[in-house]
Amino acid sequence: MEASSMLSSLNDECRSDNYVEPHYKEWYRVAVDTLIEHGLEAYQEFLIKERVSDFLAEEEINYILKNVQKIAQNTEHGSDSSCDDGSSSGTYWPMQSDVEAPNLDLGWPYVMPGLLGSTHIDLLFHPPRAHLLTIKETIRKMIKEARKVVAIVMDVFTDVDIFKEIVEASTRGISVYILLDESNFSHFLTMTEKQGCQIQRLRNIRIRTVKGQDYLSKTGAKFHGKMEQKFLLVDCQKVMYGSYSYMWSFEKAHLSMVQIITGHLVELFDEEFRTLYARSSVPSSFAQEESVRAKPGKALWENGIYQRSISSLASVSSQRNLFGRQDQIHKLDSSYFKGRGIYPLNDQDKHSMRNHGYKPHFVPNFNGPSTIRHFQPSQLNENWKRHSYAGEQPETTPYLLLNRAMNRTNNAPGRWRRPSDSLSVASSLRGGQGSQQNIPAQSFADRLAQRKTTNLAERNSNVRRSFNGTDNHIRFIQQRMPTLENTTKSFLRSWRIESYLNDNSEVPPDSNGSTLGDRFEGYENPEAVKANALYTHSRLRSSFVFKPTLPEQKEVNSCTTGSSNSTIIGSQGSDTPNEVPDTSTNAPPLTEKPLPEPSSKLPTQQEEPKMHNLQVPEKQPEALNQRTNGRAELNNCIYTNLCVNKQRENTENQQNDNLLKRRSFPSFDHSKVNLEHGNSKNYVYSTLTRNRIRQPEKPKEVVLKSSKSMHNVTHSAEEDDDEVIERDPPSASATKSISIAALLDVNKEEPNKEPNSKKEGKASPSFLKKGSQKLRSLLSLTPEKRESLAKNKAPAFYRMCSSSDTLVSEGEENQKPKKSEPKVDSSPRRKRSSSSNSQGSIHKSKEDIAVSASPGISSQAEESRRIAPSPRPVERRLSERAGDASAPRFNTEQIQYRDSKEISSLMTPARRPTPSPVLKPNELLRSHSTNQRVYSRFEPFCKIESSIQPASSVTNTHVNRPEVKSSTMGTAYGRSSPMLNYKTGAYHSYAPNENKFRGFMQKFGNFIHKNK
């Protein structure tokens, strides 16, 4: 308009097709100024003088004279009585307001431009023509169908029916914005008062007034126009626009027409409403209360400051559940509040009592129907997840926040947090939040100790579950909050990691580590160990077999399971303790005297891989020096759950052995073991990777002895031992325990071997006797018959351990001792490489089992042939009887064994086992007592196996070297070590039966042949 009425309109060459000749007339402006300044008579005189017609209607003249606002006379001119002749009426020169535009504090849906599609317009007339519904009924229907927002722009609003629909929509959580013409607002206010409703008390309704443009005269007097727009905007998707005003007369008397608009054109109405709302103002009737709230310069919900206005307090108290709704859907606008730092995320106090355990006290709900609201968890964080207009609880409005702010006058705005237990007015009125303001920072353990334990009904209540709310994760945390009952299950992993990190940072490399007694703090007796071991039975089965350990790659063992966890791996130079003290659960206090052991029975390094030890001490400077200097001290370095103290055996240990039978993890009695270890604080999980013993001591009784295969095959020439120690001390620790894979490899090359488990009967005493007789017949064979029997077919003994499953056949080392013998004397480097390669996965170990035996094992068999004498027949019978005692065989196992014929068919025929020397009386008593024992298929879940091993088992391995080695592999029940050293360098691929073999091992125990 300005461009058309100025110089641009004088140039004919710039005219376009849209050019319209300007209609501006200067005498119009002068006539209006005369009317404003001097009245109606002066106006008419001016028109006569200028010889122009009257251009103002009588209604307009009356409106101007009624609404004109003149400035005071004393300020009309300056002090020098000069007038600003350059001033203008101002209608052509828009002024920018210095007042901040009001916010759509209830929120406003965001509509992506261009996504509403093409515009569609329907025309409605009043009275109705082709439509069934009238304009008023259509308006009511649109308000009922609203889900997010209802925006009304109206000149006059006095229709009671439409007003009731709006109030009811606000109680459903729909945001309602009403813009009324300022000059007609008094009519609307009168209507609401007649209906008994205080509109300013409604929490989800915002009512503001809009006036038209200001007309400024030359002298400074002004008047403003009216807002004559009339449209209804619902959810920013549908608009009703027309001449229909919300009055009774428009329904009954006036003719009107409206348009129902959807599509792209709605975006323009959206923009227009927000423009009108920005220029709107608080009605004069509400100005007093609004001025009190806005006095600090910021909105109440921005700074949390409340001025304690009596009227505002009444407003807050009177609005509680005035139109309470049952379904709580709506939430505050997250972008608005998060941008102002009002409700920061509760990351710092997410473990506090009020977030998880705290429940609000019951407060009677006097003004509304929703009493269950006080007992429901908060949906506060839904505000950050869901759209701000998916629904809102009607309490969360600035009117509600008025009273809530009274409790936070001393708090900074940024720290103001709503409690996550309840958002109701009642919870805020009781002042419960004030006690939560200055709580000092606490650790999680302290908060957990102070946490109010919720009952089962509160934890599992499904009264109301939102799809996106926080009550889901709160319920999840409550149901899984660690308690005294499930602390073992819930904190094992975290404590294990903490213990590992603490050991890595505080313990020197050669430290003994925490004692196993410390790790078992709280387990006072074997019964307690057995009871607590039930939690971790499932971890036993897979951890021993599938997780090999090397000194180069140490693993952390579970204190309760004894299993090895390969996920925590230390390097060779790490601070993790390298050895586990040779103390057991049943072991009495250790003495200062070393065990007297003849030096002639000490093992060479070449024979040490045959030791079926669960753990092997590796402290090279100490354990090996004991071997060279004082051979009698060696057995202290060997773990007591595998070695045999034949000097100090008592029949008292038999009960404990039977009690702890069929469990393959080491148990320790902390009350009886207190070695020098500095990191006892890591008693729950300390690295059980071969803790080193500074001073081996002689135990009075060694109780936890595994079945016959848990013996020390550690006797050979003293010269070889010294030679190996001098040449390759680092590899000694790597070769002290033989892997299950090595045993499989040893027996893999005998293709004619078949299992005899299918011949065995069910688990009964007669069956055990039958199996014992067959063993006696096999053991009593002469070496010549043994050779002939090995050529045809020999039974393979399946051995079972609760931790893992392994099929091992008998005596395969003896078939090829000479082939690998030349490799032994000159292969310390090969031994080191093979042991270093043993940290590979079990898959590689099983692939390597198929082709050839380990040269180290074969060479050991050859060397032992030169040393050990042959046993006597009596010794064979006794050792066989003792071996049967620890040989459970079940019908279920037989079925599984038949399924594994493919594996066993690849095994070589077994050598005849060689019996062990004569047992002592107490050992014989143990053998007989355990021989009568009937095994149950459920024993792995009830007991910890510690089968009795006679003291002569140590001697067994020294008497007849050529046969003992094979019998050790083939007939002895052995405990698989959780830290097995796989000699993968000597193995080759073994892939066909890998999946079946793995499943077989996980179902049953560890099959290692027992030694007689």
From Swiss-Prot:
Q: Which cellular component terms (GO) are annotated to the entry?
A: cytoplasm; membrane
Q: Where is this region: DUF1669?
A: 1-283
Q: Which residues carry this modification: Phosphothreonine?
A: T782
Q: Name one GO biological process term.
A: cell population proliferation
Record-linked Pfam families: SACK1
Q: Which compartments does it reside in?
A: Cytoplasm; Membrane
Identify the keywords attached in UniProt to this record, alphabetized: Cytoplasm, Membrane, Phosphoprotein, Proto-oncogene
**Does this entry carry the keyword Membrane?**
yes
Compositionally biased intervals (Low complexity)? 557-574, 731-742
Which SUPFAM superfamilies would you find in this protein's record?
Phospholipase D/nuclease
Q: Which residues carry this modification: Phosphoserine?
A: S334, S422, S424, S466, S543, S664, S802, S852, S870, S916
Q: How is it modified after translation?
A: Phosphorylated by CSNK1A1.
Entry annotated with the keyword NAD? no
Biased composition, class Basic and acidic residues, residue ranges: 694-703, 746-762, 813-828, 873-883
InterPro entries attached here? FAM83, SACK1
A GO molecular-function annotation: epidermal growth factor receptor binding
Q: Where is this region: Required for interaction with RAF1 and for the function?
A: 1-284
The main location class comes to cytoplasm
Polar residues: bias regions: 575-588, 706-715
Oligomeric form and interacting partners: Interacts with EGFR; positively regulates EGFR inducing its autophosphorylation in absence of stimulation by EGF. Interacts with RAF1; displaces 14-3-3 proteins from RAF1 and activates RAF1 within the RAS/MAPK signaling cascade. Interacts with AKT1, PIK3CA and PIK3R1; activates the PI3K/AKT signaling cascade. Directly interacts (via DUF1669) with casein kinase isoforms CSNK1A1, CSNK1A1L, CSNK1D and CSNK1E.
Domain free text? All members of the FAM83 family of proteins share a conserved N-terminal DUF1669 (domain of unknown function 1669) domain of about 300 amino acids. This domain mediates the interaction with casein kinase 1 (CK1) isoforms. Therefore, it has been proposed to rename DUF1669 the polypeptide anchor of CK1 domain.
Its family remark reads: Belongs to the FAM83 family.
According to its UniProt entry, the function of this protein is described as: Probable proto-oncogene that functions in the epidermal growth factor receptor/EGFR signaling pathway. Activates both the EGFR itself and downstream RAS/MAPK and PI3K/AKT/TOR signaling cascades.
Q: What is this protein called?
A: Protein FAM83B
Q: Which organism is it from?
A: Mus musculus
Q: Report the gene name.
A: Fam83b
